A protein has these predicted regions:
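N-terminal metal-binding scaffold of metallo-dependent hydrolase/deaminase domains
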Residues: 1-63
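Alpha-helical scaffold segments that flank or form the walls of functional sites
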Residues: 95-164
Length: 173
């Protein structure tokens, strides 16, 4: 079992349409039933499943010597972020100059996507992408691939290795 200590912030309800319809925009942080905030909290994880969430002063008695304990005191622990729209093969073209969309696509995006025909290049580019996503707290993605599907198997393999939640499909441009 692994315990993570830190400041914990999470929402208490699954984001279903029914739950979201009941939230009044200005009331989200006024209604403490909507979220959990623990200044000195602990999350316990066993076999990849969160089994414990609570105040450290209460939970510390449950932590055994053989358990892993990670102290993130003064750090914020939140659920992973979700990137709901990303083009997985365009990492190297992000912020590339382009006067108009077609100019940008033709001069930067389409040429950079050619690299994904090589599994070696795809691994390198996807490695850069995933490092940036994880570094910024993103753990789930909805990714668009080029119409050729080049590198798709590589991205599935890498994201599976990290147990990342992924929805992928190709883009016809």
């Amino acid at each position: 079992k692994t315990f993570y200590r830190g400041t914990i912030f999470t929402f208490n309800h699954t984001a279903t349409l029914a739950n979201l319809q009941g939230v009044i925009p200005d009331s989200l942080f006024a209604d403490e039933d909507q979220f959990t905030f623990l200044r000195d909290g602990v999350i316990g994880i066993e076999d990849g499943i969160i089994t414990t969430v609570g105040d450290y002063s209460v939970i510390k008695e449950q932590i055994k010597a053989e358990d892993n304990f990670v102290d993130y005191s003064n750090k914020l622990i939140t659920p992973g972020f979700i990137d709901a729209h990303m083009h997985a093969t365009q990492t190297s073209a992000v912020s590339a100059y382009g006067e108009k969309l077609l100019t940008w696509l033709n001069n930067y995006v389409f040429p950079s996507e050619v690299a994904f025909k090589s599994d070696i290049s795809a691994r390198r580019e996807y490695g850069i992408l995933l490092n940036q996503l994880f570094k910024n707290g993103t753990t789930s993605i909805c990714a668009y691939l080029p119409s050729s599907y080049d590198g798709a198997d590589v991205l599935f393999e890498i994201t599976h290795k990290y147990n990342m939640r992924v929805i992928m499909g190709n883009t016809i441009m």
